[in-house]
Amino acid sequence: MAVQKSRVTPSRRGQRRSHDALAAKKLSIDPTSGEVHIRHHVTADGYYRGKKVIAIKASVVEED
């Protein structure tokens, strides 16, 4: 098993962890549908930058 050569100080440990913070995802509103979506991603309706790029099939609702 690997063993460190010298003890890591709290300062060094903090410097290493400084880039580990999580950031919130960037959200946008589609100009056509008004739907909230992740930036640079297609909306659930199939719109990207105000244009329909994917034809989405209508969801099937089954009744018992």
UniProtKB/Swiss-Prot annotation:
- Which UniProt keywords are given for this protein, alphabetically ordered? Ribonucleoprotein, Ribosomal protein
Q: What's any one GO cellular component for it?
A: large ribosomal subunit
Any one of the GO BP annotations? translation
- Region Disordered: start-end pairs: 1-23
Pfam families hit by this protein = Ribosomal_L32p
What domain of life does the native source organism fall in? Bacteria
**A single GO molecular function term of this UniProt record:** structural constituent of ribosome
By sequence similarity, the record places it as follows: Belongs to the bacterial ribosomal protein bL32 family.
Mind telling me which NCBIfam families this protein's record contains? rpmF_bact
Name it.
Answer: Large ribosomal subunit protein bL32
Q: Which species does the entry assign this protein to? A: Xylella fastidiosa (strain Temecula1 / ATCC 700964)
